[in-house]
């Protein structure tokens, strides 16, 4: 788990570093491969813009990206659900190998891998959508700050290439990020401290970063996380999962009670 969050942290740090690189204007004549990619993003957004409304183009572009990545996000949700179900067994392994010596750690890692293999779980599946989205976010940021026809666009109360003057988008991005994390972990049988902490820290991080990002990037974040909230409710609804789990537990208890009653009845007949 710690390694996973370390990878997330490194990916975010890389995005921030790379976002600071490259300030020159990107045009259709740019020869650099990355700048061509950035310009392709810009042209795609312009194509999707209705009546020249760049904000609409960014919203439709976000829907397009999220729809393309839908299978990966679905894999992420299913893998996360299986990981949550595995937590009791993983905790049992931690109890079995409490030592910090190299041999204990190796044995615990080996048995953990066997568990993942047994249940068909990839512990890093949840990182795939994030790692794919990082270059998308970077390219979008570069397009909004280095391509003239996007940089000068406007939508509602904001200039697409500048930060939101009223900070509405960063706040919405943080809210939808929190809802997405909360819904993802809602059905977990057990919640560890790291999970709870990340549910709080990640939205705050998004909020603080969003204050200084171009409004277009913040808009992408809002739409992307709102899309994910509805996706979770549609494909992996935690309330339905909890209700189904409760139903199965009630059925198991009822079955156990019937067995006990049958044993008592049989015992009385023998008497």
UniProtKB/Swiss-Prot annotation:
Disruption phenotype: No visible phenotype. GO terms for biological process: protein insertion into membrane; protein transport. It is a multi-pass membrane protein. One of its GO terms (cellular component) is plasma membrane. Coiled coil: none annotated. GO terms for molecular function: membrane insertase activity. The keyword Heme does not apply. Disulfide bonds: none annotated. InterPro entries: YidC/ALB3/OXA1/COX18, YidC/Oxa/ALB_C, YidC/YidC1/YidC2_Firmicutes, YidC_ALB_C. Residues 1-20 form the signal peptide. A lipid is attached at residue 21 (N-palmitoyl cysteine). Keywords: Cell membrane, Chaperone, Lipoprotein, Membrane, Palmitate, Protein transport, Signal, Transmembrane, Transmembrane helix, Transport. The chain crosses the membrane at residues 54-74, 124-144, 165-185, 200-220. A lipid is attached at residue 21 (S-diacylglycerol cysteine). It is found in: Cell membrane. Belongs to the OXA1/ALB3/YidC family. Type 2 subfamily. Required for the insertion and/or proper folding and/or complex formation of integral membrane proteins into the membrane. Involved in integration of membrane proteins that insert both dependently and independently of the Sec translocase complex, as well as at least some lipoproteins. Partially complements an E.coli yidC depletion experiment. This is Membrane protein insertase YidC 1.
